[in-house]
Amino acid sequence: MRRLPVTFDEITAPWLKEALEPSHSGLSVRSIAIGEAMHGTATKVRLHVTYDPASGASVLPSTLIVKGGFSAHRELMYREYMLEARFYSELAPRLDSIRVPQGLYAHHDDSQRQAIVILEDLDTCGATFCRVQRTLTYEQAAAQLDTLASLHAQWWESAEFASGGPLAWIDALDPLPEGVLGTYQRSRLQPAVYAECMALPRGVAVSSRFHDRDRMERAMERLREVDRVGPHCLLHTDPHLGNWYLDREGRPGLLDWQSVRKGPWAHDVNYCVVSSVDMLDRRAWERDLLQHYLGALQSHGVSPPALEEAWLAYRQQTGYGLYYWLVNPIEFQVEVNNCAVASRFAFAAIDHGTFELLA
């Protein structure tokens, strides 16, 4: 296989043919045109593809999404891109009843510090993308929790995570990991960086009690200890509204698997509910939604934690979303999104007494 593209100019018809041919023998790509680019933690670009009809490519769509590291932060975020490539090659084919975009190709190259996935274009499949600005109804939030319960149950306390197991490559959830993996996470706690974030609209929109960098760091260090306690399962880790879509039947699906981890179920559940539901609705619904999730877990054969134990774990996890949406670089999320979601987590952290729980 030739080198992975690291610029849009390197996404060529010969490269695309070579990428897709193993699963579509005899494929011939006549031409491609680079379309819309969508920037974030990773970069997605839409390809308009013309195939040779004689090559039997009628089953392939004329538009595809190529996702990978095409920005200045490619090397810093390589591990996340690699995780998504491995998700599509190793985990997506095994998922039980969880909707994700169809993956047509996934490959990573450590020497290049680049990873690429080629995905179906959901815009052509009748999908509707969820948006931070459009909060969920109770029924929509419950449907998302059903999806998370299915994901969590499939690898609940799985032996596959053990050293030497097929999923040993998946890191444990850690808000402030050591070493190279924590380069980005810990850099956001540098006093100058944190102060700069607090001066942005997201910081102005939340209570000044969250401007205390030292207190935030202590809370994250305590959350690291909390996260080491099982039971552990496979996590998406980033199930905010912008990473969900609805298929043409209105059923939820999950995007952006570049942060897949093993860790406590409460992380995903809290992150989903707090980021996706209006603040006042969250106050009214969250205990019922938590009970709904626990019931869904049980329906998949998992013995769920007791409600009060689950309620404590859920409230502790508010700290993670609060920290990351307060310090999220604008290169990854536009400020209107950072401001909206950070405010939801800040409101929840006060309601939940999260800093006190993580003292």
Enumerate the predicted regions with their spans.
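Conserved NTP-binding catalytic cores of kinases and kinase-like/nucleotidyltransferase enzymes
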Residues: 1-117, 223, 247-252, 359
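Active-site activation/catalytic loop segments of kinase-like enzymes and analogous catalytic loops
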Residues: 86, 90, 259-262, 266-302, ...
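Surface-exposed helix-capping loop/turn segments at secondary-structure junctions
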Residues: 94-99, 155-165, 297-306
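Short pocket-lining segment of the protein kinase catalytic domain that shapes the ATP-binding cleft
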Residues: 117-124
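ATP-dependent phospho-/nucleotidyl transfer catalytic cores
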Residues: 126-236, 248, 342-359
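Catalytic-loop signature of eukaryotic-like protein kinases
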Residues: 238, 242-244
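Pre-DFG segment of protein kinase catalytic domains
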Residues: 254-256
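All-alpha amphipathic helical-bundle segments outside canonical DNA-binding/catalytic cores
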Residues: 302-318, 345
